[in-house]
Curated annotation (Swiss-Prot):
Name of the protein described by the UniProt record: GTPase Era
Region (G1): 16-23
Region (G5): 155-157
Originating organism: Yersinia enterocolitica serotype O:8 / biotype 1B (strain NCTC 13174 / 8081)
Region described as G3: spans on this chain: 63-66
Subunit structure as annotated in this protein's UniProt entry: Monomer.
Encoding gene, per UniProt annotation: era
Superkingdom of origin organism: Bacteria
Length: 303
């Protein structure tokens, strides 16, 4: 009788302040894109699990919203609670910081991490953007004094530099356990959720600085069609009439571009043809209303 192969499985939280590259790191660790990215802070609003299975190892990464001090709006409070609760019951935390920058938000995150029982790996992202490399070593020494890190790894998530080192450390700290997900799973999120995230990413990419924090997307219809693809109806919610005009653009040009780009990404992700229709609606005060936020899928509970 042959011996049953041991399997290893663990949860790894990716945390840090907004806009340090957490989602880019997750996508690179998975080898494909499941978490939306942009150059704007607070792109990630929900916790997203990314699942990477390789042989006997299954790493379940939890990409969290950026932790930040500002909590004036209900959406910011929910994002902070979602990020904080993600680090409570994991095998390993990857704390992502940006180059030689250190802010009050970074300090707040490390204060939360000091009380954890699990090991914390520090990933210094965007080191390729540090122009004065002589500042890097002193900064690494400064960071190493903040708490007892498992290891400190300089990386460039965007270029894939040293991401394999992160993955290797993750494997070494996975407990022996059954896999939680089938080996072909890459995320715990539904196709409907991923469709809304793709549309939101395009909104952030093609619109101005102010709008992204006042916009969300609700998928009203996601149904298979007779051609083997999907009919998807997306409702874009904004807070003011002026924002609605901004999303639609001159003679509908902006929403058309957003729709084309989103449809292409959906077809690549779902491996099927997509018929996408988008509408824009004004819903005043949605980002300040916790009940409305929860109805739109914002939550501080792991799903």
């Amino acid at each position: 009788m042959s011996e049953v192969e041991k399997t290893y499985c663990g949860f790894i939280a990716i945390v840090g302040r907004p806009n340090v590259g957490k989602s880019t790191l997750l996508n690179e660790l998975l080898g494909q894109k499941i978490s939306i990215t942009s150059r704007k802070p607070q792109t990630t609003r929900h916790r997203i699990m990314g699942i990477h299975t390789e042989g006997p190892y299954q790493a379940i990464y939890v990409d969290t919203p950026g932790l930040h001090i500002e909590e004036k709006r209900a959406i910011n409070r929910l994002m902070n609670r979602a990020a904080s609760s993600s680090i409570g019951d994991v095998e390993l935390v990857i704390f992502v910081v940006e180059g030689t920058n250190w802010t009050a938000d970074d300090e707040m995150v490390v204060n939360k991490l000091r009380s954890l029982q699990c090991p914390v790996l520090l990933a210094i992202n965007k080191v390729d953007n540090v122009t004065d490399k002589t500042k890097l070593l002193p900064h690494i020494q400064f960071l190493s004094q903040q708490m007892n890190f498992l290891d400190v790894v300089p990386i460039s998530a965007e270029k894939g530099m040293n991401v394999d080192t992160i993955a290797s450390i993750v494997r070494k700290h996975m407990p022996e356990a059954d896999h939680h997900f089938p080996e072909d799973y890459i995320t715990d999120r539904s196709q409907r959720f991923m469709a809304s995230e793709i549309i939101r990413e395009k909104l952030m990419r093609f619109l101005g600085e102010e709008l992204p924090y006042s916009v969300t997307v609700e998928i009203e219809q996601f149904v298979p069609n007779e051609r083997g693809g999907y009919n998807i109806h997306g409702l874009i919610l904004v807070e003011r009439e002026g924002q609605k005009k901004m999303v639609i653009g001159n003679k509908g040009s902006k929403i058309k571009t957003i729709g084309i780009e989103a449809r292409q990404d959906m077809e690549q992700m779902f491996e099927a043809k997509v018929h996408l229709e988008l509408w824009v609606k004004v819903k005043s005060g949605w980002a300040d209303d916790e009940r409305a936020l929860r109805s739109l899928g914002y939550t501080d509970d792991l799903k």
